[in-house]
């Protein structure tokens, strides 16, 4: 599949998402490419690389920052490049971090703090160093956190940094 520029509708969806998460200036430093397959994958590339992509026709280029459809869905790699503010974030303690990286959901007792968001929102799970550990969906609004029992699931794990390790096939030993 060849890369192409995002069309007007896709660019509008992407810009809206970037602005919402405080990364509207991303497009002044990088160019976007769309690779169509089963999904419309969006890649960020340097302006220099963008100039030679058409000549090379590569299979891969840049960093996949997400997928676009009716909405823009950040990839895990994209969150590291794009998230510049504290919107829709949950910060967890060390135990919550470990469990989340093992694929578990976030319990209310593991949350150290949370920015403001509503129930059923997409949230970015961070450790105390502000590293994005993954993406989840809130089961409750941030306002409800203080009233929840510690063993109640607060954020459902959608994707985390440990997922690629769990899905790696290991070789067979004899």
Curated annotation (Swiss-Prot):
Gene3D superfamilies, per database record: PUA domain (2.30.130.10)
Coiled-coil portions: none
The PUA domain, residue ranges: 87-161
Domain of life: Archaea
Single annotated GO MF: RNA binding
SMART domains: PUA
Similarity section: Belongs to the UPF0113 family.
Annotated protein name in UniProt: UPF0113 protein AF_0058
Originating organism: Archaeoglobus fulgidus (strain ATCC 49558 / DSM 4304 / JCM 9628 / NBRC 100126 / VC-16)
